[in-house]
Amino acid sequence: MKQELKIPQATTKRLPLYYRFIQNFAQEGMERISSKELSEAMKIDSATIRRDFSYFGALGKKGYGYDVQHLLQFFSQTLDQHETTKVALIGVGNLGSALLKYNFQKNHNTHIVVAFDSKAPKDGKMISNIPVFHPDLLEEKYAEYGAELAILTVSPRSAQKMADRLAAMNAKGILNFTPERLTVPDSMQLLTIDLSVELQALIYLIRNQEV
């Protein structure tokens, strides 16, 4: 996705979701849609949708709504759907193995092309049709397979070291699944998904709802 537009991170995270639902509407043959209809489908407040869309100028017309094909083309270009993003996976434990098996099958422009694991032999092995190498070969194989960003599913004690190596290689970004709070250069994008924190937040919401 292009970064000429400075938009909030929360809005950025919703863009792929908008694109997915708009694809569904297009497949159903819908020609136009209102923010209310999109809100009901996505379970997102219509005011939030209008505010998100406003960052990109006039995407719709008052009294008409949004042209589905126009939105489809707009979000496809905004999210660079015409370009394939190659991803490296670092850490092939339980979560990493699941990610390899899934390999973003619904996202035709995003693919894990190479993986690294400390238990892999020096000459590599294949898991779910993806080559897996020892981390000693990270710099060499990351470049060889043309990866742009990395997914980290390693142990917390190894996470920062791996992030430092990726930064030295000028990797564009990291999706961090470890609980470690990583430090990366300003030139690198970092997104952390801590499943235990998300679960605790869900438990808190459930418990407080019951009060």
Curated annotation (Swiss-Prot):
Function field: Modulates transcription in response to changes in cellular NADH/NAD(+) redox state.
Compartments where found: Cytoplasm
Residue ranges of the annotated DNA-binding region, renumbered to this chain: 17-56
Family under the similarity heading: Belongs to the transcriptional regulatory Rex family.
Pfam family, one: Put_DNA-bind_N
Underlying gene: rex
Binding site for NAD(+): 91-96
Keywords in alphabetical order: Cytoplasm, DNA-binding, NAD, Repressor, Transcription, Transcription regulation
Domain of life according to the entry: Bacteria
HAMAP family: Rex (MF_01131)
Any one GO BP annotation for this protein: response to redox state
Description of how the protein assembles with itself and partners: Homodimer.
Keyword Lipoprotein among UniProt keywords: no
Main location as per UniProt: cytoplasm
Record's keyword annotation contains DNA-binding: yes
GO CC annotations on file: cytoplasm
Protein source organism: Lysinibacillus sphaericus (strain C3-41)
Protein name: Redox-sensing transcriptional repressor Rex
Molecular function per GO: DNA binding; DNA-binding transcription factor activity
Disulfide bond positions: none
